[in-house]
């Protein structure tokens, strides 16, 4: 799945200036090209978007309480439980009682799910490595500096 770089109808001209639209297109091109590997590999997992979001949350945060997953997803506890039932049946997550509070249920990725994530990330890492090898040391430094600036700006904008 690739971002349609020629379809600028998705860009709101009242929000983004011409220069900002160009940055957006480049930003999306980088995300789709090098992000987490080939998006088609993720599509092969044949999961709903909410299921994928749960897996991403667990991959990023480790073990989470069911209530925390529901809160982060903006979903009801019953919907979250249904999602977790399907993911557990598919062998992607495992539930257990919290060691701190036995009444609380926690969820984590199974080793199989972790292996899948490692494989998907590895493909993205290899693609990025091959791409960076094509750059001169000066170009790599420029990419690093530009991404550092953008990362700081995105973090600061998130605080507002």
UniProtKB/Swiss-Prot annotation:
Ranges annotated as DNA-binding: 66-89
Keyword Ribonucleoprotein: no
Domain HTH marR-type, first and last residues per copy: 20-152
GO biological process, one term: response to stress
One MF term in the entry's GO annotations: DNA binding
CDD domains the UniProt entry points to: HTH_ARSR (cd00090)
InterPro entries: ArsR-like_HTH (IPR011991), HTH_MarR-typ (IPR000835), MarR/SlyA-like (IPR039422), WH-like_DNA-bd_sf (IPR036388), WH_DNA-bd_sf (IPR036390)
Keywords: DNA-binding, Transcription, Transcription regulation
PROSITE patterns noted in UniProt: HTH_MARR_2
SMART domains xref list: HTH_MARR (SM00347)
Record-linked PANTHER family: MARR FAMILY REGULATORY PROTEIN, TRANSCRIPTIONAL REGULATOR, MARR FAMILY
Name of the protein described by the UniProt record: Uncharacterized HTH-type transcriptional regulator YfiV
Organism: Bacillus subtilis (strain 168)
